[in-house]
């Protein structure tokens, strides 16, 4: 029996079929169903052309109509509906120069990357498996559909996808597929870096990331990646033995940087075209690590480290130092903090200006606020304005 996500999407297939077209669930959603994993995105393949799909459904978004894909909105969800197709020649290492729509499911499945993704399922749960993908799933084997070198030449990202699937699913990559990955590996350098970043993020999240890293080393894939092209491949070798799944690319960059501090954080961010969000989280993780190295876990560390980064920090310490930190320890310390943020401090810039009316504004205000903030957080000074004022007046700041 098919699961709830497929039942929700079934009316789309029913509409296609009742109007004389074919319609199937395809790809990763079918694979994940067989593996009893959570279903995220459901993709649909059909014999209907994009124009015919748009005619059948009221809410559609023609996101990739030139390649046969439209998004159908149904039940508050978005579903990619793609016309059966054959791909033309690939010259940009990503997309075919042209596509030819076909009416045969077999032709559509034949163009897909791996056998475990070349699966289709109808609304009754009947699976179409032309390339023994179910057998490969049982064997935990990653194998290309058809000629491996052709598949990787069409889109070199498939090389990284194969390694990513080994990390996520614990699969072994079939020998012929491995050989083709090695032969075509240099084409990875032609890929858009944003696509590489997405694959690496997913790869490092996998439960079998150590296995994936070994593939990267053995196939010399690291030498094709930004920054690593300059001979920094020892980073992967250094991280392999103690790696654990890393849940964000910020954690990945933090590990890379701490294993080789000669490469600046800015260079990682720039070369992998990361967002400011990733940049800020990376910097906070690295700063927290360095503080931890000097002071251990204390009030100030938990004050400056956002709760959302705790788990990433714990993973970082484990990978770099082989030290296990319990989240409960962080929770217990945080529960005793006198303040959670600076706005709770019983001192502000106006207080300091009032207490030192003859001093011009300057850096001394910021420095003094930070010093008092640290003393209060570390419980060396009560968060009481009267006592804080006495301390400030007894420790007059440098006016410069």
Curated annotation (Swiss-Prot):
This is CCA-adding enzyme. Keywords: ATP-binding, Magnesium, Metal-binding, Nucleotide-binding, Nucleotidyltransferase, RNA repair, RNA-binding, Transferase, tRNA processing. InterPro entries: Bact_CCA-adding_enz_type3_sf, CCA-adding_enz_C, CCA-adding_enz_firmicutes, NT_sf, PolA_pol_head_dom, PolyA_RNA-bd. CTP binds at residues 28, 31, 112, 155, 158, 161, 164. Catalyzes the addition and repair of the essential 3'-terminal CCA sequence in tRNAs without using a nucleic acid template. Adds these three nucleotides in the order of C, C, and A to the tRNA nucleotide-73, using CTP and ATP as substrates and producing inorganic pyrophosphate. tRNA 3'-terminal CCA addition is required both for tRNA processing and repair. Also involved in tRNA surveillance by mediating tandem CCA addition to generate a CCACCA at the 3' terminus of unstable tRNAs. While stable tRNAs receive only 3'-terminal CCA, unstable tRNAs are marked with CCACCA and rapidly degraded. Its EC number is 2.7.7.72. Its cofactor is Mg(2+). It catalyses: a tRNA precursor + 2 CTP + ATP = a tRNA with a 3' CCA end + 3 diphosphate; a tRNA with a 3' CCA end + 2 CTP + ATP = a tRNA with a 3' CCACCA end + 3 diphosphate. A single active site specifically recognizes both ATP and CTP and is responsible for their addition. Belongs to the tRNA nucleotidyltransferase/poly(A) polymerase family. Bacterial CCA-adding enzyme type 3 subfamily. Mg(2+) binds at residues 41, 43. GO terms for biological process: RNA repair; tRNA 3'-terminal CCA addition. ATP binds at residues 28, 31, 112, 155, 158, 161, 164. The keyword ATP-binding applies. Homodimer.
């Amino acid at each position: 029996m098919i699961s709830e996500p497929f039942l929700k999407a079934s009316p789309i297939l029913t509409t296609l079929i009742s109007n004389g077209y074919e319609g199937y669930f395809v790809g990763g959603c079918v694979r994940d169903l067989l593996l009893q994993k959570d279903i995220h995105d459901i993709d649909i393949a059909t014999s209907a052309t994009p124009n015919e799909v748009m005619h059948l459904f009221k809410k559609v978004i023609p996101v990739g109509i030139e390649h046969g894909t439209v998004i159908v909105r149904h039940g508050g969800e978005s579903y990619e509906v793609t016309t059966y197709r054959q791909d033309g020649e690939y010259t940009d290492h990503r997309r075919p120069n042209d596509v030819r729509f076909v009416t045969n499911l077999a032709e559509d499945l034949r163009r897909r990357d791996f056998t475990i993704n070349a699966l289709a399922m109808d609304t009754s749960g009947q699976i179409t498996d032309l390339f023994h993908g179910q057998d490969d799933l049982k064997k935990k084997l990653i194998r290309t559909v058809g000629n491996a070198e052709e598949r990787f030449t069409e889109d070199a990202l498939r090389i990284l996808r194969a390694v990513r699937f080994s990390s996520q699913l614990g699969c072994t990559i079939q020998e012929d597929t491995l050989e083709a990955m090695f032969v075509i590996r240099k084409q990875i350098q032609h890929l858009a870096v944003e696509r590489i970043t997405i694959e690496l993020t997913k790869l490092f999240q996998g439960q079998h990331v150590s296995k994936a890293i070994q593939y990267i080393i053995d196939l010399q894939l690291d030498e094709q990646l930004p920054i690593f092209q300059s001979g920094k491949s020892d980073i992967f070798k250094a991280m392999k033995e103690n790696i654990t799944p890393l849940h964000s690319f910020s954690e990945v960059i933090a590990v890379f940087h701490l294993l080789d501090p000669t490469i600046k954080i800015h260079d990682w961010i720039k070369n992998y075209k990361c967002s400011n969000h990733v940049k800020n989280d990376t910097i906070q993780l690295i700063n927290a690590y360095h503080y931890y190295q000097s002071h251990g876990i204390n009030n100030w560390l938990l004050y400056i480290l956002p709760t959302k980064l705790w788990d990433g920090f714990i993973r970082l310490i484990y990978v770099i130092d082989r030290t296990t930190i319990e989240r409960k320890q962080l929770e217990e310390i945080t529960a005793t903090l006198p303040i959670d943020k600076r706005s709770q401090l019983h001192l502000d810039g106006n207080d300091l200006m009032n207490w030192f009316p003859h001093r011009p504004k300057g850096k001394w205000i910021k420095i003094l606020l930070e010093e008092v903030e640290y003393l209060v957080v570390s419980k060396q000074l009560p968060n009481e304005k009267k006592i804080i004022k006495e301390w400030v007046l007894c420790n007059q700041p440098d006016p410069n």
